[in-house]
Amino acid sequence: MNGILISLEGPDGAGKTTVLQEILPEIQKMKREVVPTREPGGVRVAEEIRQIILDPKNTEIDSKTELMLFAAARRLHMQEKMLPALRAGKVVIVDRFIDSSVAYQGYGRDLGVEVVDWLNYFATDGLKPDLTLYFDIDTDVALERIMKNRADEVNRLDLERAEMHRKVREGYLEIVAKEPGRFVKIDASQSLEKVVADTLEVLKKRFVSEF
Ligand SMILES: Nc1ncnc2c1ncn2[C@@H]1O[C@H](COP(=O)(O)OP(=O)(O)OP(=O)(O)O)[C@@H](O)[C@H]1O
Ligand SMILES: Cc1cn([C@H]2C[C@H](O)[C@@H](COP(=O)(O)O)O2)c(=O)[nH]c1=O
């Protein structure tokens, strides 16, 4: 496969989605076609699974069911959208991917890293990002952002106790430390302008010949 896979990761409220929208005009100047997408979702059936997973009324979804729903959505998304784009040499930039399952289900839900790594491998046949930008932020600051700016859009995961969100962040920090070659950590507590500038700097430095 000769495409490039970039994933964006971080706790809820870190600003990934906002940053992706901001950087798109600049990265669309890359020599290759850029395909922005997200998980869970990205294709029709995976977006339907997303609705089920994130609906606050679906309180009967337990941790293992949740993990498998994310994996099913990932498989659909990868087969239908990500792999064809990567095979065509495009740049796929995905808002959340395998590391979200490790951080949220592995650490946050206490299912453990081993089982989540295994299921991620099963769902993706071992596909890994070339680069993962990890947007790091203190849990309380991130939750405050969500409640302040998009309280009308909170989903089932956003509504989890702060304790789970803290475990998710600690999980991310452990994952990032384990694979320094793949991850770049970005301080997401800065102003949006600075976070966007840092993100573009990393991308332009890493993919210098692509711009
Ligand atoms: N650097 C920033 N400073 C202050 N507010 C920000 C910053 N970045 C994003 N925000 C705001 O914080 C809120 C959360 O941002 P956003 O939805 O992009 O985060 P996210 O990481 O995609 O979260 P989630 O994973 O929960 O969807 C939004 O209302 C956004 O406007
Ligand atoms: C892919 C994936 C996501 N999650 C969680 C993380 C967020 O709380 C939601 C997705 O909402 P967003 O607004 O698109 O960030 O789902 C998860 O727990 N496990 C995963 O694999």
UniProtKB/Swiss-Prot annotation:
It catalyses: dTMP + ATP = dTDP + ADP. The keyword Transferase applies. Its EC number is 2.7.4.9. InterPro entries: P-loop_NTPase, Thymidylate_kin-like_dom, Thymidylate_kin_CS, Thymidylate_kinase. It comes from the Bacteria. Gene3D superfamilies: P-loop containing nucleotide triphosphate hydrolases (3.40.50.300). It holds the Pfam family Thymidylate_kin. ATP binds at residues 10-17. GO terms for molecular function: ATP binding; dTMP kinase activity. Keywords: ATP-binding, Kinase, Nucleotide biosynthesis, Nucleotide-binding, Transferase. GO terms for cellular component: cytosol. One of its GO terms (biological process) is dTDP biosynthetic process. Phosphorylation of dTMP to form dTDP in both de novo and salvage pathways of dTTP synthesis. PANTHER family: THYMIDYLATE KINASE, UMP-CMP KINASE 2, MITOCHONDRIAL. Belongs to the thymidylate kinase family. This is Thymidylate kinase. It comes from Lactococcus lactis subsp. cremoris (strain MG1363). The lineage of its organism: Bacteria, Bacillati, Bacillota, Bacilli, Lactobacillales. The gene is tmk.
